[in-house]
């Protein structure tokens, strides 16, 4: 039976996901069969698994780091926010409900069984299970019926290492404060801590490090400097969307929708040396000198159509198009480009019909059945293969479908306007296909690099593991697992 170790954080976006990925690669290189696990995740950035379900994108990256296929057991409970107070609840890869926050709180006790079932199945297949927590165990208001952090750790008897983010400031108060506010039995599960995202000379933090050890009685496993190549790895949280710019390069803009989903579609583009990827934030105008505007996926197509219009982006898009610019809509963005989006059954919210942007002559009707599959398609314009996945509800049809974006099993997929400058597709992950990406950028007169995307991700994972091995007591961490 496998051993297990849990990585929890002093807060969100402290680096838990990347540390688990780096440890997974490091321990896999030692010859261990490592499997990642996150009991509960909240993300609209999902990956399609080999068993036909969906999990958080971070667990898919961790699986890649461990050299295994992603599986629904790696993330048994996935919450996909649709509004500020409600989310789709996905269990073992399949949607079971849409619940408001209080409704979900009432569901959690019944979900612990599903979490433990998945955990036990992974343990039966692994030498080591690396568990990632969610948010912070310091949120004691959520401790009752918790399945994500200490509730799981104690039920499954998994030791915990806590990650603190020094880049935000206040890391001493974060870690010492957690020891102060959580239940003593929960605190006893924490065996140590790691300081993450340090910039500069780590010896300057020696006194702070010793103070944390003294105040908490937890063992320190090291100070991890800022990892410069983190931007080369897919990010799961919208917080991770980069504002890094490349002045003088060809601009591609992406709209930062309020319910943006599967934005890792952008990752291969941002790594292209000749592409200056601009995230257009709420309240900002779409720059007038971009060659392509991408409308990304959304967890709430009609809601984000209203959000898009509230920013004035509909007017900006029309101006961009009239100047000769190109537009690409992916999944929910594809639906928005059409003449209308109808939701007669209220799948995404109140039933109704919302006018689209009208840049494609298609209409979308939402339906309860969800398409969730990995696919191999062929780009219609260049005949290049595309390895991708679909994860959407709704069906789109109309005259512009006569000019498909791609062919999928011999059938048309997506739509293109009569002048070829507006394109829509349900294919996610399409830009990871190197030959297609190069052909697509070439048509926009943007030079593309030759380095394969997946090779770059693999290289970054190896570098992350090297970085962790150099700065943390990795053997000490492994010795904690039980």
Curated annotation (Swiss-Prot):
One of its GO terms (molecular function) is catalytic activity. The keyword Kinase does not apply. PROSITE patterns: GATASE_COBBQ. CDD domains: GATase1_CobQ. SUPFAM superfamilies: Class I glutamine amidotransferase-like, P-loop containing nucleoside triphosphate hydrolases. The active site is at 331 (nucleophile), 428. Pathway: Cofactor biosynthesis; adenosylcobalamin biosynthesis. GO terms for biological process: cobalamin biosynthetic process. Keywords: Cobalamin biosynthesis, Glutamine amidotransferase. InterPro entries: Class_I_gatase-like, CobQ/CobB/MinD/ParA_Nub-bd_dom, CobQ_GATase1, CobQ_synth, GATase_3, P-loop_NTPase. The keyword Iron-sulfur does not apply. Residues 249-436 form the GATase cobBQ-type domain. Belongs to the CobB/CobQ family. CobQ subfamily. This is Cobyric acid synthase. It comes from Bradyrhizobium diazoefficiens (strain JCM 10833 / BCRC 13528 / IAM 13628 / NBRC 14792 / USDA 110).
């Amino acid at each position: 039976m496998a051993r297990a170790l849990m990585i929890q954080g002093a807060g969100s976006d402290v680096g838990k996901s990347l540390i688990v990925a780096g440890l997974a690669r490091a321990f896999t290189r030692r010859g261990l069969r490592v499997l990642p696990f996150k009991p509960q995740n909240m993300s609209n950035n999902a990956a399609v698994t080999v068993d036909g379900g969906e999990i958080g994108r971070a667990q898919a990256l961790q699986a890649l780091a461990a050299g295994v296929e992603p599986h629904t057991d790696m993330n048994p409970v996935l919450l996909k926010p649709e509004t500020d107070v409600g989310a789709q609840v996905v269990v073992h890869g399949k949607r079971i409900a849409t619940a408001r926050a209080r409704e979900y709180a009432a569901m959690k006790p019944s979900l612990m069984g599903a979490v433990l079932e998945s955990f036990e199945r992974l343990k039966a297949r692994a030498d080591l299970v690396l568990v990632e927590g969610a948010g912070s165990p310091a949120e004691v208001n959520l401790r009752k019926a918790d399945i994500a952090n200490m509730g799981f750790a104690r039920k499954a008897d998994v030791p915990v290492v806590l990650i603190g983010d020094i880049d935000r400031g206040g890391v001493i108060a974060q870690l010492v404060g957690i020891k102060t506010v959580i239940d003593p039995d929960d605190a006893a599960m924490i065996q140590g801590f790691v300081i993450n995202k340090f910039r500069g000379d780590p010896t300057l933090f020696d006194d702070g490090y010793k103070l944390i050890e003294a105040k908490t009685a937890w063992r320190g496993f090291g100070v991890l400097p800022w990892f410069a190549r983190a931007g080369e790895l897919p990010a799961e949280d919208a917080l991770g969307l980069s504002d890094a710019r490349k002045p003088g390069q060809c601009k591609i803009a992406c709209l930062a929708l309020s319910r943006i989903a599967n934005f890792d579609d952008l990752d291969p583009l941002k790594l292209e040396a000749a592409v200056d990827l601009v995230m257009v934030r709420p309240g900002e105008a779409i720059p007038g000198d971009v060659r392509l505007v991408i409308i990304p996926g959304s967890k709430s197509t009609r809601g984000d159509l209203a959000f898009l219009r509230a920013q004035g982006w509909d007017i900006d898009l029309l101006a961009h198009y009239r100047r000769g610019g190109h537009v690409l809509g992916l999944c929910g963005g594809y639906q928005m480009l059409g003449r209308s989006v109808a939701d007669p059954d209220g799948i995404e919210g109140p039933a109704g019909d919302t006018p689209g942007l009208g840049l494609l002559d298609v209409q979308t009707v939402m339906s309860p059945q969800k398409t969730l599959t990995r696919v191999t398609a062929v780009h219609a314009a260049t005949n290049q293969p595309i390895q991708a996945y679909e994860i959407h509800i709704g069906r789109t049809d109309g005259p512009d479908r006569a000019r498909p974006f791609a062919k999928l099993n011999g059938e048309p997929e997506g739509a293109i306007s009569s002048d070829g400058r507006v394109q829509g597709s349900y294919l996610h992950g399409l830009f990871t296909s190197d030959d297609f990406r190069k052909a697509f950028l070439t048509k926009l007169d943007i030079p593309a690099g030759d380095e394969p995307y997946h090779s770059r991700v693999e290289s970054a994972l190896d570098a992350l593991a090297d970085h962790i091995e150099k700065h943390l007591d990795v053997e000490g961490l492994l010795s904690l697992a039980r």
